[in-house]
Amino acid sequence: MINAPRVCVQIQSFYVESQSEPDEERFVFAYTVTVRNLGRHEVQLLGRYWLITNGNGRQTEVQGEGVVGEQPIIEPGGEFQYTSGAVMETPLGTMEGHYHMVDHQSKAFQVPIPVFRLAIPSLIH
């Protein structure tokens, strides 16, 4: 799409050891997402789609309105940051997906969320 709004997504994930129970195959991860509007007009995040893949290859799809209960409007040069989480039965997995957004003229567009890893620190070299 030519003239598509310029939106950048950055993600940092981390293992939440205090809420995890490895002996019961429960691994809790959190991730902080920063959505930046690099364009000249405001954009609004309306919904999300996630594809979560655990270490055994089992996939779970999650979709819904907004993020953390919000549908933020992001001004030009602005950003929106939030933290959320995922629970898996393996110590390693990935997440990826896209955001459903609209531009200042209410035209819908998608912003891809690049694949990122969820892993306990001892598995990362």
From Swiss-Prot:
GO biological process: error-free translesion synthesis
InterPro entries with a match to the protein in the record: ApaG_domain, ApaG_sf, Uncharacterised_ApaG
Disulfide bridges in this chain: none
Domain of life, source organism: Bacteria
Pfam families listed in its UniProt record: DUF525 (PF04379)
SUPFAM superfamilies per record: ApaG-like
Domain ApaG: start-end pairs: 1-125
HAMAP family with a match to the protein in the record: ApaG
Name of the protein this chain belongs to: Protein ApaG
